[in-house]
């Protein structure tokens, strides 16, 4: 898979999310902030029958994602656009599954990592609002984020009618979790299952 210096690069969090998200045959899947298309590639490797749509604001990322899908002879749609305009870009409830590895750090947090890691172009609320619009009732939204933002994440999910149902922490051995994987259901009933952590050596 080709990567580019001005496009958010492949990381272990994307790998973890690609393995955590539940994907079923012939589902329509939306990747919010798709970057170079890595999550779509993971999911297509697991279930080739799905229909992947990637969305990214960065035109270089969109071009790279299209190249990566084509290089692997995979059929996917990649859209250049702002997820804050999801209502204009996609019909309501069009997707069975929405996935995202969004910016982690709130503006003003003191972290300096560019828009791919900082909430400069979109906030956690923006991501959840877009997912809540695009996913169908009973559909799923899978996201990876930072453990210290978990309360913010749960609040945003419920604000947009998505109920957290599955969760797994990701950590190095003998260290605190560095990431958390969450899958929420649109209009789901309360009841969260917490899985054993994924431990990285």
Regions of interest found by a model, annotated:
Residues 36-49:
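Conserved SAM-binding loop of SAM-dependent methyltransferases across substrates and taxa
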Residues 65-66:
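Conserved SAM-binding loop
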Residues 2, 6, 123-177:
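Conserved Class I SAM-dependent methyltransferase catalytic core
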Residues 73-83:
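Conserved SAM-binding strand-loop segment of SAM-dependent methyltransferases
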Residues 102-130, 138:
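Mobile active-site "lid"/loop adjacent to the S-adenosyl-L-methionine
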């Amino acid at each position: 898979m080709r990567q580019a210096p001005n496009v958010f690069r492949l990381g272990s969090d994307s790998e973890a999310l690609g393995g955590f998200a539940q994907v079923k045959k012939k589902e329509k899947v939306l990747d919010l902030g798709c970057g170079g298309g890595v999550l779509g590639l993971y999911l297509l490797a697991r279930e080739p029958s799905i229909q992947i749509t990637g969305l990214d604001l960065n035109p270089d990322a969109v071009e790279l994602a299209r190249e990566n899908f084509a290089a692997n002879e995979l059929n996917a749609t990649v859209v250049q656009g702002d997820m804050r305009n999801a209502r204009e870009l996609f019909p309501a409830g069009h997707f069975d599954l929405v996935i995202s590895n969004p910016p982690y750090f709130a503006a003003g947090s003191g972290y300096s990592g560019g828009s791919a890691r900082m909430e400069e172009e979109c906030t956690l609320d923006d991501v959840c609002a877009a997912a809540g619009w695009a996913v169908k009732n009973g559909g799923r939204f899978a996201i990876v984020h930072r453990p210290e933002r978990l309360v913010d994440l749960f609040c945003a999910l419920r604000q947009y009618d998505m109920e957290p149902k599955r969760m797994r922490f990701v950590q190095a051995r003998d260290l605190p979790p560095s990431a958390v994987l969450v899958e929420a259901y649109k209009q789901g009933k309360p009841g969260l299952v917490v899985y054993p952590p994924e431990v990285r050596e």
